Amino acid sequence: MAKNIQAIRGMNDYLPGETAIWQRIEGTLKNVLGSYGYSEIRLPIVEQTPLFKRAIGEVTDVVEKEMYTFEDRNGDSLTLRPEGTAGCVRAGIEHGLLYNQEQRLWYIGPMFRHERPQKGRYRQFHQLGCEVFGLQGPDIDAELIMLTARWWRALGIFEHVTLELNSIGSLEARANYRDALVAFLEQHKEKLDEDCKRRMYTNPLRVLDSKNPEVQALLNDAPALGDYLDEESREHFAGLCKLLESAGIAYTVNQRLVRGLDYYNRTVFEWVTNSLGSQGTVCAGGRYDGLVEQLGGRATPAVGFAMGLERLVLLVQAVNPEFKADPVVDIYLVASGADTQSAAMALAERLRDELPGVKLMTNHGGGNFKKQFARADKWGARVAVVLGESEVANGTAVVKDLRSGEQTAVAQDSVAAHLRTLLG
């Protein structure tokens, strides 16, 4: 007997019971995006490897340790996308969407990182990302955060997430801060773990993000990034904070929030939660005003964020059990008798024409009434439409409300109107 082939570790199947809740959550997210005027862009999952090295940074964990990179038959180095921003910027440059234009874009799909699988963190994971190009003021940063807050309210999780903000300033301000931070870390090198020692010279701001408690205690005495900000970045950040306060969105300034990718500047933010056991990031982003030019385009201001859908689904299920998947079926068409199946299928097609958007399933595979009604219950149907030989003969159907048990004989021409009333 042949050995079963299993899914790759950290790359999961999502079965029908799971995808139903995903679809409802994704539908909620997309409705909010539409209400803000954002447009979908669809991007390849494979890009040239240099795109990510230039965008994310050669000495980041993503590029050094986590990318799925391979050589194709032409000898080109290709990578499964570890994030979406770089590909979105590449597409914008390639298709002339960015220079002197305003774009509000979103995308959704799988990303890939070779890291240790754990709850809410997988090697193939799904993100929804938003990217805005051509706007440089703090008002668009605030709009993106307000958009995410509207998501949390719609999903019933607003009380379970907290907004953390920071400004990491301009490239020049970060260079000055980097020098001061490295000088401080060199004085306390014996207190650093091996990972922080490695990062100290390659990407010292990432030391601020260390999860080591001893390093975090040391950093209490380190220079503060906020003391090195340029005046424009200070004004930008103050403007953002004022807009959020006016919108009633609470936030915490976290001066150690730097994000893990090199392309950010000025605003960075994260929505975090403690409702999944340990603190976890649900959604994160910031400004990346230099990335378009860095990837070969004309200088264009930009800001965006990405949200991990696996972690969002876990959070919704943990704190809002009333947020359930929509039923697979609204109406189940029961047919019994030797000559009723073709009539039942014809009636089903007519009802689909007259009731667009309603989910109707026709019984197949035979079975008596008891078995067919059991199938209707299994699929979550609210209403059954019943056709027997006598109903076919006299042009009627029985419509049964499966919640109340009430049933009515209705002329087939009137079934759609009757169902419309029952389903509301």
UniProtKB/Swiss-Prot annotation:
Ranges in coiled-coil conformation: none
Record keywords, A-Z: Aminoacyl-tRNA synthetase, ATP-binding, Cytoplasm, Ligase, Nucleotide-binding, Protein biosynthesis
Top class in the EC scheme: ligase
GO biological process, one term: histidyl-tRNA aminoacylation
Keyword field contains Ligase: yes
One term of GO molecular function: ATP binding
Catalytic activity: tRNA(His) + L-histidine + ATP = L-histidyl-tRNA(His) + AMP + diphosphate + H(+)
Main localization category: cytoplasm
E.C. designation(s): 6.1.1.21
Transmembrane regions listed in the UniProt entry: none
Alphabetical list of Gene3D superfamilies matching this protein: Anticodon-binding domain, Bira Bifunctional Protein, Domain 2
Subcellular location: Cytoplasm
GO terms under cellular component: cytoplasm
Pfam family, one: tRNA-synt_His
Record PANTHER family: HISTIDINE--TRNA LIGASE, MITOCHONDRIAL-RELATED, HISTIDYL-TRNA SYNTHETASE
Subunit structure and binding partners: Homodimer.
UniProt family annotation: Belongs to the class-II aminoacyl-tRNA synthetase family.
NCBIfam families: hisS
Name listed for the protein in its UniProt record: Histidine--tRNA ligase
Species in which this protein is naturally found: Shigella sonnei (strain Ss046)
Lineage: Bacteria, Pseudomonadati, Pseudomonadota, Gammaproteobacteria, Enterobacterales
Gene: hisS
